[in-house]
Amino acid sequence: MSLTMRIFTASRNGQRLFGSHGARLLAAQRAEPKDIVEVPKGYVYVNNKELSMEFADITDRAASTMFFGELLRGFAVTLAHIFKEPATINYPFEKGPLSPRFRGEHALRRYPSGEERCIACKLCEAICPAQAITIEAEERADGSRRTTRYDIDMTKCIYCGFCQEACPVDAIVEGPNFEFSTETHEELLYNKEKLLCNGDKWESEIASNLQADHLYR
């Protein structure tokens, strides 16, 4: 019997080759389909089909490859977060920390003596981009000016903080309260009494926030 080996299959990447006597050889060089010496009857070379270079076939292969890769990446992200501590909190029973620069519900502040801080300069009214602030003022007997009307339409306010930045005496501020939803539109039309009440309620937190942020103001 001839010792000539009959190569049944050959890999493009030069993997294992099988002979008629069952010997297994490791190809050192790349084997192309044209290198096959003889294909016995009953055997079919299954890797002989060339990849189609049509645009539709190329896009299909690329989409399949990317989809499979993104699918594995998504699974990896999911598995990585399964064992991590949840980032959510049980609101409203739990609340996250707020920055000292947080811009919430508006308030008018007083001095420790109880005197209103606002000097009716109307800078906040002038700078408000939403035109949500309306101020009326009059002069007192001692020559100082104080507001007789200070209204804020909270439905117009965009919480930009310009009013607080423009105020020279830190009278109008945006406090730490963000839970002030209402059932009617009228409840969001704040007058001077409402704003002063907010200031009295949140004065301690407002003062500490202003102190914590004083280097950046």
From Swiss-Prot:
Outcome of gene disruption: RNAi-mediated knockdown is lethal. RNAi-mediated knockdown in the muscles impairs biogenesis of the mitochondrial membrane respiratory chain NADH dehydrogenase (Complex I). RNAi-mediated knockdown in neurons impairs neuronal ATP production, reduces locomotor activity and shortens lifespan. In addition, results in large vacuoles in the retina, ommatidia disorganization and selective axonal alterations in mushroom bodies.
Subcellular location: Mitochondrion
Domain 4Fe-4S ferredoxin-type: 109-138, 148-177
GO BP field: mitochondrial ATP synthesis coupled electron transport; mitochondrial electron transport, NADH to ubiquinone; mitochondrial respiratory chain complex I assembly
Cofactor requirement: [4Fe-4S] cluster
Gene3D superfamilies in alphabetical order: 3.30.70.3270
Binding site for [4Fe-4S] cluster 2: 157, 160, 163, 167
GO molecular function: 4 iron, 4 sulfur cluster binding; metal ion binding; NADH dehydrogenase (ubiquinone) activity
Transit peptide stretch: 1-26
Keyword Transferase: no
Details of cofactor binding: Binds 2 [4Fe-4S] cluster.
A GO term from the CC aspect: mitochondrial inner membrane
Keywords, in A-Z order: 4Fe-4S, Electron transport, Iron, Iron-sulfur, Metal-binding, Mitochondrion, Oxidoreductase, Transit peptide, Translocase, Transport, Ubiquinone
PROSITE patterns associated with the record: 4FE4S_FER_1, 4FE4S_FER_2
Catalytic activity: a ubiquinone + NADH + 5 H(+)(in) = a ubiquinol + NAD(+) + 4 H(+)(out)
Protein's UniProt keywords contain Transit peptide: yes
Tissues in which the protein is found: Expressed in muscles (at protein level).
EC nos: 7.1.1.2
Entry binding sites for [4Fe-4S] cluster 1: 118, 121, 124, 128
Domain of life: Eukaryota
Major localization class: mitochondrion
Family per record: Belongs to the complex I 23 kDa subunit family.
Complex and partners: Part of the mitochondrial membrane respiratory chain NADH dehydrogenase (Complex I). This is a component of the iron-sulfur (IP) fragment of the enzyme.
Stated role: Core subunit of the mitochondrial membrane respiratory chain NADH dehydrogenase (Complex I) that is believed to belong to the minimal assembly required for catalysis. Complex I functions in the transfer of electrons from NADH to the respiratory chain. The immediate electron acceptor for the enzyme is believed to be ubiquinone.
Name listed for the protein in its UniProt record: NADH dehydrogenase (ubiquinone) 23 kDa subunit
Gene: ND-23
